[in-house]
Curated annotation (Swiss-Prot):
<keyword id="KW-0368">Histidine biosynthesis</keyword>
<dbReference type="InterPro" id="IPR050064">
    <property type="entry name" value="IGPS_HisA/HisF"/>
</dbReference>
<comment type="subunit">
    <text>Heterodimer of HisH and HisF.</text>
</comment>
<dbReference type="GO" id="GO:0016829">
    <property type="term" value="F:lyase activity"/>
</dbReference>
<dbReference type="InterPro" id="IPR013785">
    <property type="entry name" value="Aldolase_TIM"/>
</dbReference>
<feature type="active site">
    <location>
        <position position="11"/>
    </location>
</feature>
<keyword id="KW-0963">Cytoplasm</keyword>
<dbReference type="GO" id="GO:0000107">
    <property type="term" value="F:imidazoleglycerol-phosphate synthase activity"/>
</dbReference>
<comment type="pathway">
    <text>Amino-acid biosynthesis; L-histidine biosynthesis; L-histidine from 5-phospho-alpha-D-ribose 1-diphosphate: step 5/9.</text>
</comment>
<comment type="similarity">
    <text>Belongs to the HisA/HisF family.</text>
</comment>
<dbReference type="InterPro" id="IPR004651">
    <property type="entry name" value="HisF"/>
</dbReference>
<protein>
    <recommendedName>
        <fullName>Imidazole glycerol phosphate synthase subunit HisF</fullName>
        <ecNumber>4.3.2.10</ecNumber>
    </recommendedName>
</protein>
<keyword id="KW-0456">Lyase</keyword>
<dbReference type="InterPro" id="IPR011060">
    <property type="entry name" value="RibuloseP-bd_barrel"/>
</dbReference>
<keyword id="KW-0028">Amino-acid biosynthesis</keyword>
<dbReference type="GO" id="GO:0000105">
    <property type="term" value="P:L-histidine biosynthetic process"/>
</dbReference>
<dbReference type="Pfam" id="PF00977">
    <property type="entry name" value="His_biosynth"/>
</dbReference>
Length: 252
């Protein structure tokens, strides 16, 4: 069995790391490079940067942050936000990203997933799904930073992402985002069971038990969290030790 990954997520806007609840009400959490360096030292498996205003405000990609970060942080770096074409993917990879995450543009043009995967390799392509429950056992895909309901079924979209050649799915529950109530385990399990590629669970981590639940009950391959790490409640090392104590294989 592959070791399960713990991935701190940095939501970046205007060059600062922020954290909100249900995609609004943002609170400043610090300098992105400094924070990423701290996670590198704590033993994070990867770090994810999401430029959360890039798609909605048509802002260009945070290349300068990525370049500086890649010089100082030596774990895989995933970057998303404002990715609209294959050229954007290339620019991010050239700046030092290891993987590129796309969301809104992939929904608007699913061929982008296939084109990007074909040109740079599927291992570099992550497709993010922002999902919100609309009925029991049913979730819709939202775009533009969680502002636009596409009406698309999240499970069906996940299957299509898999078929188009993406390397993994970053699955965020908008209902749980920032609430500290734990992952939406039903959503996580439904998507994990529907696809062959790895699924990263995101949205709602409030304690270490939630991280373990994402793997054991949600069947996720990796778990992503922000505020529990940013504001010093837990270190990545503590999270890994807890998961190992629950019998989950992690890289210590």
């Amino acid at each position: 069995m592959l070791a399960k990954r713990i991935i701190p997520c940095l939501d970046v806007t205007a060059g600062r790391v922020v954290k909100g609840t249900n995609f609004v009400g943002l609170r400043d959490a610090g300098d992105p490079i400094e924070i990423a360096r701290r996670y590198n030292e704590q033993g994070a498996d990867e770090v994810t940067f999401l430029d959360i205003t890039a798609s909605s405000d048509q802002r260009d990609i945070i290349l300068h942050i990525i370049e500086a970060c890649a010089e100082q942080v030596f774990i895989p770096l995933t970057v998303g936000g404002g990715v609209r074409k294959v050229e954007d993917v290339r620019r991010l990879l050239n700046a030092g990203a290891d993987k590129v995450s796309m969301n809104t543009a992939a929904v608007q043009n699913p061929d982008l997933i296939f084109d990007a995967s074909s040109k740079v390799g599927s291992q570099c392509i992550v497709v993010a799904i922002d999902a919100k429950q609309v009925a029991p056992g049913q979730w819709h895909v939202f775009t533009h930073g969680g502002r636009n309901d596409t009406g698309m079924d999240a499970i069906e979209w996940a299957k299509k992402i898999d078929a188009l050649g993406a390397g993994e799915i970053l699955l965020t529950s908008m209902d749980r985002d920032g609430t500290k109530n734990g992952f939406d385990l039903a959503l996580t399990r439904a998507v994990s069971d529907a696809v062959k590629i790895p699924v990263i669970a995101s949205g709602g981590v409030g304690n270490l038990q939630h991280l373990a639940d994402g793997v054991t009950e949600g069947r996720a391959d990796a778990v992503l969290a922000a505020s529990i790490f940013h504001f010093g409640e837990y270190t990545v090392r503590q999270a890994k030790e807890y998961m190992a104590s629950r019998g989950i294989e992690v890289r210590l």
